[in-house]
């Protein structure tokens, strides 16, 4: 009987010794583990503390961001004042389009924007009309309708302000530790193409239709758009003093563009835009530093042409991809909710965007569970690595979809890659940090979860070049860059060659080094 008691005594002593070491082991966290713990402490301290923590977290990029909707109303009004644009005080929009008129040229029914500082009430009304600020849903004025109406209110300013607008968005991104933007934009020249579009005979095939457009000079229009973007970007970088001894923080943000096609139009106008967008992006991607890196279709998905011609639009893209096989496509699909359209309209948009149009990414994807065979679709998206651009605030204010009604948890459960994005941060009066906080508070996303979203935003970006990673779980880097990955050391040799050849890999290494600095700083705070 003595042997068991002796063993028990030895086990007790061993347990005491182990317990003495547990606190020290618990404190021996990796920088990532400590950062995750710090985020949980911030979460427990409340929304403001969580926001402060997330503001400094590296976020990679914003992949779903409309340039016109990203600019805050105050900027548009300041530019309108500079140009002495006339404002209709009843309709709350710009009435003088194009070239800036002389001071005092507004008629008695309109107001010169330069006088707005003396008209605070009108100024406030304009900000509210240009955005979701102070919006309260009412009969005849839903969040959906108010949101999309904002674009008609602030449309019409001179395109010469575009470098300033991009600078504003890039500066805001830099302040939140973002490093990459894919901004959706419709060039002014596209509106001329739309106006000149003519009907074609019903028997004309897509290839012949495309050739007719090219023969009519659409290729020259594409060149003009690319040259204009070159000028805009040069002006922006000069304004930000990029490449000088005192660059603005916005210079640290890599900016690329998605050609934005307006889809709520007759088929000939949509087709001509898609061809033009493909022409622009294909030529740009073949250059040494492309600005346009992909294509998207925009405007409300529930609008008349958007719904009636949805399958037709997917077929147009599919037919044209044979001519432009290297141009990536992301599509707004599933930005719908029950009641907004008939039930039949919820059953196929996401699937057709992927299976017909060949979209590599999906914007919104809110109605995925109303699609035919939704679980099959989720599994297919995971297998194909189709990323969903998640816009939480936008889905809330436009569709009324939030919390348990949002498919974000389902996408994550089925391993469909996601990346948080803003959609129209100026209209919604938010930023990407707000979306990270919303995801953390609403869906209990942890630091590793948010870190994966940030990594996804670069991995699934349309930046050209080879990925830094050999897997989609971010565990196996390219061997040549393994040493540089988790340090602040400058890449050399074969790794440096990879980064030079691949803008994507360069941005991925930059993100990892930002995580390294952020997490080590978080760990240092505990000592």
Predicted regions and their residues:
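Bacterial N-terminal signal peptides that target proteins for export
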Residues: 1-12
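N-terminal metal-binding scaffold of metallo-dependent hydrolase/deaminase domains
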Residues: 8-9, 26-28
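Bacterial N-terminal signal peptides
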Residues: 10-20
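Metal-cofactor-binding active-site regions of metalloenzymes
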Residues: 27-527
